[in-house]
Amino acid sequence: MASGLGSPSPCSAGSEEEDMDALLNNSLPPPHPENEEDPDEDLSEAETPKLKKKKKPKKPRDPKIPKSKRQKKELGDSSGEGPEFVEEEEEVALRSDSEGSDYTPGKKKKKKLGPKKEKKSKSKRKEEEEEEDEDDDSKEPKSSAQLLEDWGMEDIDHVFSEEDYRTLTNYKAFSQFVRPLIAAKNPKIAVSKMMMVLGAKWREFSTNNPFKGSSGASVAAAAAAAVAVVESMVTATEVAPPPPPVEVPIRKAKTKEGKGPNARRKPKGSPRVPDAKKPKPKKVAPLKIKLGGFGSKRKRSSSEDDDLDVESDFDDASINSYSVSDGSTSRSSRSRKKLRTAKKKKKGEEEVTAVDGYETDHQDYCEVCQQGGEIILCDTCPRAYHMVCLDPDMEKAPEGKWSCPHCEKEGIQWEAKEDNSEGEEILEEVGGDPEEEDDHHMEFCRVCKDGGELLCCDTCPSSYHIHCLNPPLPEIPNGEWLCPRCTCPALKGKVQKILIWKWGQPPSPTPVPRPPDADPNTPSPKPLEGRPERQFFVKWQGMSYWHCSWVSELQLELHCQVMFRNYQRKNDMDEPPSGDFGGDEEKSRKRKNKDPKFAEMEERFYRYGIKPEWMMIHRILNHSVDKKGHVHYLIKWRDLPYDQASWESEDVEIQDYDLFKQSYWNHRELMRGEEGRPGKKLKKVKLRKLERPPETPTVDPTVKYERQPEYLDATGGTLHPYQMEGLNWLRFSWAQGTDTILADEMGLGKTVQTAVFLYSLYKEGHSKGPFLVSAPLSTIINWEREFEMWAPDMYVVTYVGDKDSRAIIRENEFSFEDNAIRGGKKASRMKKEASVKFHVLLTSYELITIDMAILGSIDWACLIVDEAHRLKNNQSKFFRVLNGYSLQHKLLLTGTPLQNNLEELFHLLNFLTPERFHNLEGFLEEFADIAKEDQIKKLHDMLGPHMLRRLKADVFKNMPSKTELIVRVELSPMQKKYYKYILTRNFEALNARGGGNQVSLLNVVMDLKKCCNHPYLFPVAAMEAPKMPNGMYDGSALIRASGKLLLLQKMLKNLKEGGHRVLIFSQMTKMLDLLEDFLEHEGYKYERIDGGITGNMRQEAIDRFNAPGAQQFCFLLSTRAGGLGINLATADTVIIYDSDWNPHNDIQAFSRAHRIGQNKKVMIYRFVTRASVEERITQVAKKKMMLTHLVVRPGLGSKTGSMSKQELDDILKFGTEELFKDEATDGGGDNKEGEDSSVIHYDDKAIERLLDRNQDETEDTELQGMNEYLSSFKVAQYVVREEEMGEEEEVEREIIKQEESVDPDYWEKLLRHHYEQQQEDLARNLGKGKRIRKQVNYNDGSQEDRDWQDDQSDNQSDYSVASEEGDEDFDERSEAPRRPSRKGLRNDKDKPLPPLLARVGGNIEVLGFNARQRKAFLNAIMRYGMPPQDAFTTQWLVRDLRGKSEKEFKAYVSLFMRHLCEPGADGAETFADGVPREGLSRQHVLTRIGVMSLIRKKVQEFEHVNGRWSMPELAEVEENKKMSQPGSPSPKTPTPSTPGDTQPNTPAPVPPAEDGIKIEENSLKEEESTEGEKEVKSTAPEATVECAQPPAPAPATAPATATAPEDDKAPAEPPEGEEKVEKAEVKERTEEPMETEAKGTTEVEKVEEKSAVDLTPIVVEDKEEKKEEEEKKDVMLQNGETPKDLSDEKQKKNSKQRFMFNIADGGFTELHSLWQNEERAATVTKKTYEIWHRRHDYWLLAGIINHGYARWQDIQNDPRYAILNEPFKGEMNRGNFLEIKNKFLARRFKLLEQALVIEEQLRRAAYLNMSEDPSHPSMALNTRFAEVECLAESHQHLSKESMAGNKPANAVLHKVLKQLEELLSDMKADVTRLPATIARIPPVAVRLQMSERNILSRLANRAPEPPPQQVAQQQ
């Protein structure tokens, strides 16, 4: 026999049996047979999914020699030093274990090792060495040194010591030792290369191992020899499986010696093998190891492999073949064995194969780490592994056939087979027995997983101990023996689900034959007892519950492995489940006694969890006839979906089967006129014959029924009089062709009236249908019941369920014709000519849209939509799809026709009669003023024919009343703790300036609502809560934790004693969980419904609760899920545990009890936690209730429902002050009684009073109002507002959104201290060390707070950033006396603020500002910047705004500024609070505000020096002319300075900083905001001064004048709080560059050096400016020179006037050089007025402040700024004089604007201590510029010499010029690259080291009040 293809294992001389035992200690862990059933547990996740098939060599098998699994492992472990020496070894047993056994086959061992052993192992080694040599010839691996050299890496110079060779005995240990050494030398080595080097190193290490001949080797040799000797006992037999049994002489069944802990050490030879027939021993091939190629592509399996697969597939089909998957339906075909091919190879061929080395289709990388190297190959799939990557890792390669962990898990085992495509065929050795057969049987007993003598099955690989069989066998049987698995009967079908299991009866015992030599007197041996086995009760796929039956465990295990495993996992398999399925034992016992049939069914089915309904026919859907003429019926079972319908034969015994067959044929006959029916004649059954409806109408529908017709009497029901009236009205409307809305109040039986209406149409011959009813899924069961009761002759189909159910309904219930609808799960159109089988189709809203294909293809006689407010939005898909259906008549049912507004009502009417109601605008316009009587009458007339609405109060005069009481409850101490904690934790979100948004506030409200309900709703509290052993909360602690539960406990006790029953509603399902625990603790029985409980279960719970004598005392419902179509009239007390946001949901909820059938007074208790968000929500809900019904609001229907941020903030504040006050007064303790009279205590008396049912309702007014709003008409009731109408304006205004006055600092004051305390505690607890507290100027804060509180009328939390300068300005001077109100304006206090959003005459108003006024306001902002604090008295108030009160104006300014600060896309249509944006561009507005604030600040700085008149001599003239005082501003030409602005002399240090901020923001277009004022305030002055001294580049011309003011200016107080302005972006070009480069300019020296180049970008931008400036200069000079003579006198006067003005732009603009030149010219020529210079610039800015941005004409016309006209006087006669003048002013202003921005940047740079970054590209530009300058200056003389004709100088000059040119072109290139570097400027937030939120909140803060002396000056 040829050996394997690898190198041999070294072996030593003798080896004893003890050696084999010793090997047990070294072996791989055994494959855990005890885990056979679930091998997943043995393997890591990663190994499971990768399965790939590989080819294996074949080896003959012998079943007769016993084998030991563990010994096989030992042998494997001892073979060879390293993985590369191990060759593929044979696997000897086939595994066909459906349980997924981990059994791995191994080699056999003979009891005695013969003397030939050593010789054998030597010859084996020799042969293997030869083969290895051949292998090496073909592919010699490189040494590690060669590999490293090839890759250019360093080798390690470690010399292995003797100790190393002793300790590093396996690859893993070696790898762990050597790998770090290699990595240290070559840190960047790739993993794949590392693996190759390690492999090579290990190979060398193993080869050089001096100990390899000793113990380890001898062990291996012993193992090899042992195996060889074992092989000598193997006899070859025929490969093919045994043919079908024939008559043969009796022989013993097959046995074998299995492996395992109990296997015998020295087993005897098998009795079936004659000693004479021992074949020659075979050699053991070691396991295959492959050295994977690195980086090679993963191979796909070869084509031969595919061929084999095909072949094996054919073979597998044969009856006699067996495979791994025998008995396992879930096995994949890939795992089947590839059967051997019959061909044998010749020896020569085999040798050739050996020379070639083996080629496999294995992957050449490790499955786990995906790297190559030395890998061992799996024999049952193409995977390969490193030994160290296995889990657990192998120390030595296993010998023989080895399956990888994946195959072990999948249950795939190696099977011997021929594989001639791979050239690995192994021939039998000469002299071998051709009959020899491989033993494919399991090595372990299938039952106990142990070894020993095993009985082998003749047709499958299973083996058993005879004592493990059930019943046990006394001895090995004779002849062929089939195991239990092979004799296991097949299942009768596919199992759908396992219902239950039980222990079966043990099989009858096996008699033990008396031994022949036994004493005849001894008693016969005791028969062997069998064991009871599990029996499983299963439901079969496609069969009804009638066919459920018991199957054995083995059957399930074989045929439904996955299902069986899953069932085992989920259920206790030791103790069978009890048979009690919630039925009432007492009742069922009584019934069993009376009804033997029931007793039988109980015994067979019901006790095992099958409900009686599932075995009752609901209806027969269809029939079919088979070839033999037998009829089968498709039956739909009660309470089961359609996909559980099953075909049953006509002669099956089923209760009422004949009745249903009869009704099926009756209906068929009725609809199709068919008489004949196939099959047996039906038995006569008493069944009311269906009457065919008349062909033509028999009754005039317009005639009223005085009493109900006979066909209704036949149903046994009686309609109420008002229902008869409803029926008459519906029939009348049908006759008139009027589509209708039945809007009766909830609980008046709209469903019944509708069913009766449809039934009357059918019975009277008006229509046979089909009728379509669309209802909420939860109410469909109720609809079914009502139709069953009131319309028994109608065929009603419920079209709901999953795809499968609906497909069955479509195929069988839509039409009698087979091909009317295309089959399949996708709905398709129904054929036009096909007749419809049903009369009524009930379906849900969703399916109307999902299955519109089929439903839309049917012509419906009538559509009914239940809960029709689903149609209130004409944009919904439901509305649009339903509109496309073919509908002859429409009826809408709704209990709340006017749930929100008139628009929704219009949509309902539009759906009903689109031809009449199609113009929404017209409709809304017509009824815009619904408050007027005639309008209401008109609307009622219009609605009259379409709507009918009755109230319970109208129709049930004797119906018990209902009383709703609001029960105020206290917070428990624990709730108070959490309430405070939630508020404190969310301080940032609550604080108006902290940037909280609507969502975060809503989250806070929800948390507080949870806290009011129960603190255990928070995970933290739930974790800490004391629990009982069973996991439920401890009852007393649960109750103590919540004020509501404390009260509920007392109430329920009294209610229970009084015999009342209670419904408890909560919005939160988790609260319902807690209530369940509470009720369990109190011992009350209850039912529960929430959103997770669907139709059937829901109805069952309701039925149980409503059943007479039901024990359930409480019913827990979730407000929304329990709100629709549920009748719980047996309860008379409703407790609303927490109120819903939407009051309609609460009304829906308590209407569950207050409805038809109620005979007791209903008490409704609404729990409301006092002084909490709940109390406020209840108030808001009441207000909403009144609004929704009293105020008809056209408008954004669906959007109006959500809470505004304002409402949320208001809700959150409610009660908080008191809560935190408690803390202060009680010292943190609980409220003491008597301390606070407002605390509510419920003692017994109070509870009695509360539960007294005679008390009158105290707080139900809003509900009465709601119900009475329809009292005037039975049709379309509408309500008039009861408030008396104010002035006309108020009447017309429709409030869309109200804005309330809010104290923005409420949270700041309330929570700041708590919050900071909490933060400190957190920091301390988290161990972050002591926190350095941020310095907070509390003084400033308190001043700001006071301002905000006193004056800010409308600052609300609708904005993340909620501050505006306008307000600040007003507020700073709030103490100063205001101007009295003008005519036409009421006093602020008299008139409340207008609502935030309102609609007046179709136009939207914002805080009372209409579109024109809003536009005017925006224009004023763009003209003047921020409104000053006295805007009310200045030019600021344009004509359009004069009608506004000061309060309104301030409120609007505040709102406008908050909108500017609100982040968001400019494209949005509205701001966060719903105010329309109207195309407002924040960027432009902020830019303008910023520029104007800079100008205003600059003018104020020098105003006290320069006065108010540019040419003071004109002042007197003007005074005389106009008789007006310059001090008091006229509306047109007001004072330049706004009184609020700081006087320039005041050395208040804050201003620059503040304005710095302004621009900061401007400068960065990120609208993020600027640095915090407070910090800036403190340090800015110094910074500014520092920056201010150097910048003026012309100290000569502007000596003290320039710098002194500059110094002065630094501390000047900024104008009114223009922090917002900061956001404005001033000049796009200069802005950002300045910002960046400003960093570089902080150092004073730099600035002095003329750091113009520092800010290269600006310089670049300024090139344009320079050109402009030069032009301006020309114009100026020309202009200046012409009028010389005219202005001499003026100049003399002027020279005496004191003047100061400077802009410290650091030389970054041309301004100072211009000023220098201009002033020089002006001084020389004495034309101070005529030549434009610094003075003119100041007055230009002053004019802009007074007249507005770019109002050049107004400025020129103002005599105060006459100086600006002087330079242009000479040009007056030119045609384009005005154009020249305006262009010049505009360009000059641009330059000033730029300079102002730079000045601000420099101040900030200084303040922020920015330093130059030498690596910045602009610095390179700076050095280049210095080079240019230096080069130019040092060679100035050359030009003169060159001009003088000096030729050498000329040549040098050319070179210098060339150098200059190069330098300049380099600079130009650098400049073009600069913008890219600018783009990387960090955002404002980063540069300010502040978070965006802090910046925004800073912006929202108002500026501090000026110091007292300043205020005095202002006044």
From Swiss-Prot:
Q: Which UniProt keywords apply?
A: Acetylation, ATP-binding, Chromatin regulator, Cytoplasm, Cytoskeleton, DNA-binding, Hydrolase, Isopeptide bond, Metal-binding, Nucleotide-binding, Nucleus, Phosphoprotein, Repeat, Transcription, Transcription regulation, Ubl conjugation, Zinc, Zinc-finger
Chain positions covered by the region annotation Required for interaction with PCNT: 1570-1915
Q: Glycyl lysine isopeptide (Lys-Gly) (interchain with G-Cter in SUMO2) cross-link located where? A: 126, 139, 172, 290, 297, 611, 689, 704, 1205, 1221, 1232, 1297, 1521-1522, 1558, 1565, 1577, 1609, 1620, 1639, 1646, 1650, 1663, 1673, 1690, 1868
Q: Where is this motif: DEAH box?
A: 866-869
Biased composition annotated in UniProt, kind: Acidic residues? 35-45, 128-138, 304-316
In alphabetical order, the GO MF annotations are: ATP binding; ATP hydrolysis activity; ATP-dependent chromatin remodeler activity; DNA binding; DNA-binding transcription factor binding; helicase activity; zinc ion binding
Report one GO cellular component: NuRD complex
Tell me which residues bind ATP: D744, E745, M746, G747, L748, G749, K750, T751
According to its UniProt record, what is one Pfam family this protein matches?
A: PHD
Task: Give the sites modified to Phosphoserine.
Answer: 44, 296, 301-303, 312, 421, 508, 524, 1202, 1301, 1342, 1363, 1524, 1528, 1530, 1563, 1569
Entry annotated with the keyword Acetylation = yes
**TM segments?**
none
Residues in Helicase C-terminal domain copies: 1047-1196
User: Superkingdom of the source?
Assistant: Eukaryota
Region annotation (Disordered) ranges: 1-150, 236-353, 503-530, 571-596, 1337-1394, 1518-1694
**Entry-linked PANTHER family:** CHROMODOMAIN-HELICASE-DNA-BINDING PROTEIN 3-RELATED-RELATED (PTHR45623), CHROMODOMAIN-HELICASE-DNA-BINDING PROTEIN 4 (PTHR45623:SF22)
Q: By what name is this protein known?
A: Chromodomain-helicase-DNA-binding protein 4
